[in-house]
Regions:
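HIT superfamily nucleotide-processing domains
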Residues: 1-133
Length: 133
């Protein structure tokens, strides 16, 4: 089912983000801590409306936020990604952008970036998944 707004998706139980996990919220985008982070600081940038122009705004917000974290030295690098569709691993069927902080040594071989995700952290539904400390 397609939801037109974040509020509509939340009311239907299709948007699992909670007020307690909110990092930022404005007219266009809400930012939440990921419930199943692949790295400490993993955030979701969620457009308030399911419209391409607003989804693009969420993507811009994520890039700007990640860039600022690198400039201030809080992060060394970052990945930005969107899972579009079930075959791509999307489990929450409302658009959202992942911003994943990266640090030297967080995986054995970072070559390829998002092509390899982060070993052992991709499938948070498997037995034994542990959130990064």
């Amino acid at each position: 089912m397609r939801y037109e707004t974040l509020d509509e998706a939340a009311a239907a139980g299709a948007a699992p983000w909670s007020d307690e996990a909110t990092e930022h919220s404005d007219y266009h985008v809400a930012v939440f801590r990921d419930a199943y982070p692949v790295a400490l600081g993993h955030l979701l940038f969620v457009p308030r409306w399911n419209k391409n122009v607003i989804i693009e705004e969420a993507l811009k917000y994520a890039f700007r936020f990640g860039h600022q974290k690198v400039v201030t030295g809080e992060w060394e690098a970052y990945n930005v990604g969107i899972n579009c569709g079930e075959a791509a691993g999307q489990t929450v069927m409302y658009p959202h952008v992942h911003l994943i902080p990266r640090r030297v040594g967080d995986c054995a071989d970072p070559v390829g970036g998002v092509r390899g995700v982060i070993f052992g952290q991709a499938n948070y539904k498997k037995t034994g998944y542990q959130k990064p400390a």
